[in-house]
Structure formats: structure tokens, C-alpha cells
Regions:
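Disulfide-stabilized cysteine-rich extracellular repeat microdomains
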Residues: 9, 14, 22-24, 31-33, ...
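Glycine-rich, low-complexity segments
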Residues: 1, 25-63, 138-158, 283, ...
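Short hydrophobic/aromatic-rich beta-strand motifs
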Residues: 63-71, 85-97, 105, 118-134, ...
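Extracellular beta-strand solenoids
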Residues: 6, 11, 19, 28, ...
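Exposed extracellular interaction/assembly regions and N-terminal maturation sites
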Residues: 31-33, 39-107
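Beta-strand-rich receptor-binding modules of extracellular spikes/adhesins
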Residues: 2-40, 128, 136-153, 311, ...
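Low-complexity, glycine/proline-biased repetitive segments and flexible coils/loops
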Residues: 154-430
Length: 430
């Protein structure tokens, strides 16, 4: 065997050097090193030529190429070549880490895939990279790698949150206090990718038919998860009752905001305490005190933004507080109005129910956490159910939710925020 020893091969003209002819084999002996540091190498078997990022719903793949695929906006179906040679390699990678939201489907295009002609393979794991090699007609394309690649450093992003408890209900019959609004709390916290955050949405308290029974208090709303400071908003306190001749149910109940006290000729009820349990900033306000004498009047339930009015005044429910977590200003957690003979209180802004002279009191607004309105007629109004809302950057929204929340993208001043509105219990995986 002839041997040629040189330190450098340079072209006699131009910039290309050709080694041998088609079909020739060049062996690199065991232990030798082929150093291509700093060079651009193309066309070597097993090394794909990487293409620009694919964002479309379909792609026709070519052997020897690598494809970064972005499924942020839509799923993608890749059609493999109709014919292939042994050793052909194609690579697909989850460019935006969104395969779990919008999957990659591979159309086999008549060739086998792992020895099967159907069904088409689907890759739906976040961060997945799929490298396939064509082996032969029997097995066809074989994945040499189809695993997920975890981030070496946990990825985090900021989320704005609104948590509103369920509003309180009211007594029935006459002179009842309005229901207190559910607690109103906001928070901005850091979420970590792949961790699960659990949401509970509180129901409104029940309105009752008896004038000797105070309305039911609302239930708590909360969000919790690993590394998260749990935020809990209390349910609104139930409105106090006329409760004649006894006096055990005249006071409004404590809660996120307190229920209004019931009216009575000699011993009216006191308003329930808001911000119970205590939080900073305060999650709500006190209910008003009922009025004695003629005409006796139930007081308004407390709202997130104001105390309920006393029965000696208007008996109106306290106004709620506004939040822009959805991208626009919405007012939540208004207190319910108290009832009296000839005069009834209005519900506070933010879903508080109005009191009525006849029929049933108005219910607090669902998913605003408003307190129910009292009545001089039949059943007291029920409190409105609470709500939990998350606002995260569009670019980081994972799409992994349970409990059927309403999800709206492209919100906020920059049209780049995703709003996740939970109207019932559920989870969000970041």
C-alpha cells in the first residue's frame, strides 16, 4: 500500500479540493482524531443540515435535515419522504417547548415506522427531540432518540392573580341585613414550569326563607402550589335576621366582608366584621348596623372597597374594588343591600344584590363574589360565587389546565398576556 505524507493539501486553483472518486472509502484509523474545530462541516452521514424554524401546520421532510418545529399556535403534521435509503436521518425538535400543547404528528407516507404501517406516530411531550433513521423495508424508520430534554435550570415567570371568595347570603321575610362580599385579594408571584398550581373557587352563601335565620356565609377561594405563597380569600358573612322575639341571629356574620345587621324594634343586630381572618392588605370591610325603632331597617353588607351602610341610613351594600387582571377594569366583591319597611338598600358596585320589597332578594352576581340582597317578601338573596384569575405572559402559557377555565390570549396593553379565569375548581400546570 502506497503512503503519502503531507502537512497540508491546498487547491491548485479555486477553493475546492476533491479526495478520491465516487464510491471510494477513506478510513480514519482507530485512535486518530479528525479535528474540525471552528470549521463548517456539511454532508456527513448522521449530521443533519438544520433548517429554519417551522411554524406551519404541515411540513414535508427531506432526509439529512433537521427541523426545529414551533407549535405555539398550532399542531404540525410532518410528511416523511415517499422513498428512503438505508441510513437516511431526519431530526425534529420542539423549538418552543409546546409539543404538550400542540403535538407533532408524523405521516409515514406509505413506509413503515418501527415496523408498523399505522397509526401515525404522535409526539406530545414538552421539549421532545425526535431523531429517526431509515433501516430497511421491514422496520422502516426507527427513532434513535425520542426523549424529552428537561431544562437544566427550572424556568420561571411572573403571574398576576386575583382571588375573590363567595359572597354571603341573606335571611328571608323582613328587615334582614345584606350579605357581605367575598374577600378580595391580589398577588403577583413567580410560577415554575411543570409545577401544578391548585385553584379552589368558593360558592356563594345560601339565601334563606326564614326571618329568624341569618343568611349563609360564602366559601373560601384560594390558589396554592409548590413554592407559592398560598392566597386565601374568605367567604362573605351572611346577613343578620330580624329574628323576633329571639336575638341570636340578628348580627351579621364575620367574613371577607361582614354581613349587615338585621333591623329590630328594640335590639337590632350589629354588622359582621370584615377582613376576617385578618390579611394585609385588608380583604374586605365591616357590615353596617341594623336600625331600631320605626321603621326598622336591615343594614348593608360590607364590600371590598367600603363598609356597608347602617340601617339608619340607606342600608346600601358597600362598594367593591376594581381589578385590571383581565386587561380591563372590572369591579368585584360588592356588598348586598338591607331591607326595611318601605325602604330597601341597593347592592354595592361589584355584584352586590339589591334588597327588594316583595318576592325574593336579588342574588349577588356569580363570579364577582357579591353579597346577596335582603327582602321584605320571600327568600333572601344568595351570595355570588367567587372567582380566581391568573394573568401570565402569552409566551409562557402552557395550555395545561383542568376544570375548564376560560382562557383568553392577546390581552393587556401590549396584547401579549393570557388570562386564565377559573369559575370553578381546577389546576394550572406552568
Amino acid at each position: 500500500m502506497s503512503e503519502v505524507k503531507v502537512n497540508k493539501i491546498s487547491p491548485r486553483s479555486g477553493t475546492d479540493v476533491t479526495l478520491g472518486d465516487s464510491g471510494d472509502t477513506f478510513d480514519v484509523p482507530s485512535g486518530a482524531t479528525l479535528d474540525v474545530t471552528g470549521a463548517t462541516v456539511t454532508g456527513l452521514a448522521g449530521l443533519p443540515t438544520w433548517q429554519s424554524v417551522t411554524t406551519g401546520a404541515t411540513l414535508t421532510a427531506v432526509a439529512g435535515r433537521g427541523y426545529p418545529i414551533d407549535t405555539t399556535s398550532n399542531a404540525c403534521t410532518v410528511t416523511l419522504p415517499a422513498s428512503a435509503s438505508v441510513g437516511d436521518v431526519i431530526v425534529f425538535t420542539d423549538y418552543a417547548r409546546k409539543f404538550a400543547v400542540n403535538a407533532l404528528t408524523i405521516n409515514q407516507n406509505s413506509l413503515n415506522y418501527q415496523g408498523n404501517s399505522s397509526p401515525n406516530p404522535v409526539y406530545d411531550t414538552k421539549g421532545e427531540t425526535v431523531c429517526i433513521v431509515y433501516m430497511d423495508a421491514t422496520k422502516g424508520w426507527i427513532p434513535t432518540n425520542d426523549g424529552a430534554v428537561a431544562n437544566e435550570v427550572p424556568q420561571t415567570y411572573s403571574a398576576d392573580m386575583l382571588i375573590v371568595g363567595g359572597g354571603g347570603g341573606c335571611s328571608g321575610g323582613e328587615y334582614g341585613g345584606g350579605g357581605g362580599a367575598g374577600g378580595f385579594r391580589t398577588s403577583t408571584q413567580t410560577l415554575t414550569e411543570d409545577l401544578v398550581y391548585t385553584v379552589t373557587v368558593g360558592d356563594g352563601g345560601a339565601g334563606v326563607s326564614s326571618s329568624s335565620q341569618k343568611g349563609g356565609s360564602g366559601s373560601i377561594s384560594s390558589i396554592s402550589g409548590t413554592g407559592l405563597t398560598t392566597i386565601t380569600s374568605a367567604g362573605g358573612g351572611g346577613g343578620g335576621a330580624y329574628d323576633h322575639p329571639a336575638d341570636t341571629n340578628r348580627d351579621g356574620a364575620d367574613g371577607g366582608s361582614g354581613g349587615g345587621g338585621g333591623g329590630h324594634d328594640t335590639a337590632p343586630g350589629a354588622g359582621g366584621s370584615g377582613n376576617t381572618p385578618s390579611t394585609s392588605p385588608s380583604q374586605g370591610n365591616d357590615g353596617g348596623d341594623g336600625q331600631s325603632g320605626t321603621p326598622y331597617q336591615g343594614a348593608g353588607g360590607g364590600g371590598a372597597g367600603a363598609v356597608g351602610a347602617d340601617g339608619s341610613g340607606t342600608g346600601n351594600g358597600g362598594n367593591g374594588s376594581a381589578s385590571t387582571v383581565t386587561g380591563s377594569s372590572v369591579t368585584y366583591a360588592g356588598g348586598g343591600g338591607g331591607s326595611g319597611s318601605g325602604v330597601v338598600g341597593s347592592g354595592g358596585t361589584g355584584g352586590g344584590g339589591d334588597a327588594t320589597l316583595t318576592g325574593d332578594g336579588d342574588n349577588g352576581t356569580v363570579n364577582l363574589g357579591g353579597g346577596g340582597g335582603a327582602t321584605q317578601g320571600d327568600d333572601g338573596g344568595s351570595g355570588g360565587k367567587g372567582v380566581v384569575i391568573l394573568n401570565v405572559p402569552d409566551a409562557y402559557y402552557s395550555g395545561a389546565v383542568t376544570g375548564s377555565p376560560t382562557v383568553t390570549t392577546g390581552q393587556g396593553a401590549g396584547s401579549d398576556e393570557t388570562v386564565i379565569k377559573f369559575t370553578g375548581d381546577g389546576t394550572y400546570t406552568a
